[in-house]
Amino acid sequence: MKMTNKKMKKELMERLARPEWEFHYDSEKDVLRIEQKDTKKGINVSLPGVVAKWEVKKEAAIEDVVYYVTEALLAMHKEENQSGKIFPVIRSTSFPKEAEEGNPFIMTEHTAETRIYYALDSNKTYRLIDERLLQKLGLTEQQVREMALFNVRSLNYEFKQDQVAGNTFYFLNTNDGYDASRILNESLLQSMREKISGDMVVAVPHQDVLIIADIMNEIGYDIIAQMTMKFFAEGHVPITSLSFIYEDGEFEPIFILAKNRKKTNGKEKG
């Protein structure tokens, strides 16, 4: 049998077929590229070179290439996972507790409305850490929690500010996927506590916003309730429509309905 570049390409693609890998062929250079779908990292294989080796080593030449490419791509994937940073993400308590049956996510209770999950971030995307991924990473749950809290403190924060009826509202919205996660940055909360005169109210209506409010009057509570409900309804990953009083390092949910009262004949009408 005469081996050609075309036949070799077909042979390699069949032997290297994996759902997480994809192939790209440069017909001008006769180069087959095998790369990871998610990271786009990969290996280039010169088909004429493999064909030349096949003329001498036959089947062993193909086996050598398959082994080399497989090991290299698996090593890249492992390196990608290990080099990824771990961050905490805030989710609603109604969020699933398992990636699939028998494979629970790594979680920590947070408030009556929220729960902390942990994400392995590889710059372009992130994956929530479940027990199977935890084993692959070779980490303990405690190590994951410590790394996540350390990394969330490294995230920058710059608030936009708005004042309404004597109340001040601070908004954080960087869209990096971890805006709500900054609620776990204790030093951030303490620095905000020092500049707040009234009640400190915190809200994480969805993944991409953190609201901190300096509430001075009842109108302020109405505004934060309406605001949180609006953000919750609009969020891509909604968390909770409730806001929280923050005091002494604790979050207490505010069970308050947004009111839009009108006065009729001197009486309040709901």
Curated annotation (Swiss-Prot):
The record ties this protein, via InterPro entries, to: DUF1444
What family is this protein classified in? Belongs to the UPF0354 family.
What name has this protein been given in UniProt? UPF0354 protein Bcer98_3354
Which organism does this sequence originate in? Bacillus cytotoxicus (strain DSM 22905 / CIP 110041 / 391-98 / NVH 391-98)
